[in-house]
Amino acid sequence: MGTPIKASLLALFLFFLLSPTAFSVSNGGLLRVGLKKRKVDRLDQLRAHGVHMLGNARKDFGFRRTLSDSGSGIVALTNDRDTAYYGEIGIGTPPQNFAVIFDTGSSDLWVPSTKCDTSLACVIHPRYDSGDSSTYKGNGTTASIQYGTGAIVGFYSQDSVEVGDLVVEHQDFIETTEEDDTVFLKSEFDGILGLGFQEISAGKAVPVWYNMVNQGLVEEAVFSFWLNRNVDEEEGGELVFGGVDPNHFRGNHTYVPVTRKGYWQFEMGDVLIGDKSSGFCAGGCAAIADSGTSFFAGPTAIITQINQAIGAKGVLNQQCKTLVGQYGKNMIQMLTSEVQPDKICSHMKLCTFDGAHDVRSMIESVVDKNNDKSSGGEICTFCEMALVRMQNEIKRNETEDNIINHVNEVCDQLPTSSAESIVDCNGISSMPNIAFTIGSKLFEVTPEQYIYKVGEGEAATCISGFTALDIMSPQGPIWILGDMFMGPYHTVFDYGKLRVGFAEAV
């Protein structure tokens, strides 16, 4: 997450306290750190987590095993309604516990510091106190990681880090002194533990995983993820350091070499919609296995093609049309009466701001999900845009029905490629499978796996898991394969042989 890859959706996480932690010792004296799942507002969670982890500075992830008597670590993961997976670590002596996302898309470890006393996001989460640790060593090098419009700022320190039953000594990490409240205030997790390569560290710090290997704490230079996508089950998933758990996959893994150190990046082939080639990536695309991202993200052209095939419509477009349907006729009546146009939206309590914005700023406000909400946010912007079009149509003496139709056309023209897209929940069973060619093998995901269903019955909302992200590289367009892919496919990150492997998860 602290790197040049970026996502477009960013919103608040709903804040719930972490459940009590359960400890148990099993096979070979391995310590299992169990966490409970919370039932939370899944729509807000996926908006928040889904792509704040695809950032100009990036982040997220978590898993399990059946290993030998020693040389491995297991961290039980909490499934936060299919939008984030996190587990518990300890920093210092005695250990101070933190819930962290295990993120293969970044490489730094950071947690809030007791020196962070002005950001609410720090204050409401556990904070690391160097004065309470006998193994703390100062560093002081400043660090910052950008997350879209949010960021963390802090400084490096060094201490022991406990992950499962493994204790990593002399680990550099960031104590945050500032955290963006919009991004982190209501997050379930306290910090992030990066599992990417050192090349993308904000301060070129040696990552936790490197030190596990260098200090001989694991038998194999391998870690693996199993993500349980069944939100109703207690076990959220497991991250295994030092090996894999054969209980959580079927058959053999298909391995592909890492093509660019930094991210866990590899070469991917054609993308199929149903059983038909999309024509994209047939000549090769770069792909990144990223536990810190909920969605699939890829080039706009293919994402648009997929979303059209599944009948997806932009959330912004639908919200705009809903406003027009509910308030359009009243707005027209007010425009033809004596109410000042720039007062109508506030009069209808759709804006808290009395005044007018120019059209350009309105459009930018809609596209920028992190715009200043002091004037009422997106709904206010939709209202102001609709009024501008209505005034023009009234001058042309258009009928009320024609005016409404023309304003709906404006709603259809709002940019949607980087925003959430919704689908008809009743049509999921008829949607096509999407397949990715990796190592000459097809890896399919079903509609049930790439659609988020929020709520039940008539109140249900179904959201496409495909979002646009245009990043060009020397290797070609880049895809991000997040938790929606790593759920169906058990994933192995082989540091020793610099390869990534996928097998059907069970």
From Swiss-Prot:
Annotated transmembrane regions: none
Spell out the InterPro entries in the cross-references.
Answer: Aspartic_peptidase_A1, Aspartic_peptidase_AS, PEPTIDASE_A1, Peptidase_aspartic_dom_sf, Phytepsin, SapB_1, SapB_2, Saposin-like
Q: How does activity depend on temperature?
A: Stable at temperatures of up to 60 degrees Celsius.
Query: Which residues lie in the propeptide?
Result: 25-70
CDD domains reported in the protein's UniProt record: phytepsin
Which residues are responsible for catalysis? D103, D290
Q: Which GO terms describe its molecular function?
A: aspartic-type endopeptidase activity
Q: What is its main location?
A: membrane
User: What's the pH dependence, according to the entry?
Assistant: Optimum pH is 5.0. Active from pH 2.0-7.0.
Q: Which UniProt keywords apply?
A: Aspartyl protease, Cell wall, Disulfide bond, Endoplasmic reticulum, Extracellular matrix, Glycoprotein, Hydrolase, Membrane, Microsome, Protease, Secreted, Signal, Vacuole, Zymogen
Please give the superkingdom of this protein's source.
Eukaryota
> Matching Gene3D superfamilies, A to Z?
Acid Proteases (2.40.70.10), Saposin-like (1.10.225.10)
Cited function: Aspartic protease. Cleaves alpha-lactalbumin but not beta-lactoglobulin.
Q: What is this protein called?
A: Procardosin-B
Organism source for this protein?
Answer: Cynara cardunculus
